[in-house]
Each structure stands twice: as structure tokens, then as C-alpha cells.
Amino acid sequence: NSFDSVLITDATKAGKIIYANKAFNRLTGFGVKEVVGKTPRILQGPATDKKVLERLSKALQGGKRFEGSAINYRKNGNPFIMHWRVVPVKVEKNTKVWIAIQREGTAVE
């Protein structure tokens, strides 16, 4: 029962969503069953800062954590500012996932 939105993706280049909590649903309007198997790109749109996404991608490819914020979009198409922190977590010997903790913000940092 987290206040923050939690999204877990596989650590492959595709980064498919394997888990989302109820706070993700409240934040974005997307149901958990709607997003599992998709990528977080479903939240991106025309005003999403591509430079932030490039920094995110570079950090993840290097196995590093990332913190950032950007304009994302709810299921209904309304834009909002999302702040997020993504960390790599090893769950088995050779298996890693990315855990993203997200919350709505008032300004892009």
C-alpha cells in the first residue's frame, strides 16, 4: 500500500513492465493488467523531454541508478510532471530488474 507509484520492469533493452502497484493506477489512470508486458513508453508523448530519456537510457545500460523528471501522460491524455528514481535490483544469480519509484511533481527539475 505505497503512497508512491512503483513500477518494475525487466532489465532487458525492451524494459517490459512486470509489475505496477495501485498507486501507479491512481497516478496514471492505467490499470495494472493494461500495462504488464508493455514498456513505460506508454506514458510518453510530444512534450516528454527526449534528453532526459537519453540520460535515463544511458544510466540503465550502464547498470546505474537514475533520478529525473519529465512530462508524462495519463491514460486520458492529460500531461503531468513525473519525478522518478530507478534502481537496478538483482533478484537471482543472473537476473536483474529495474524498480522505478514515481510521484507527481509540480515542476520539472
Predicted ranges, named:
Residues 6-8:
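Short hydrophobic secondary-structure edge segments in sensory/regulatory modules of signaling proteins
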Residues 11, 71-77, 90:
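PAS-family sensory domains
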Residues 36-47:
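PAS-family sensory/regulatory domains
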Residues 84-108:
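Short loop/turn elements at sensory-signaling interfaces that couple input to output
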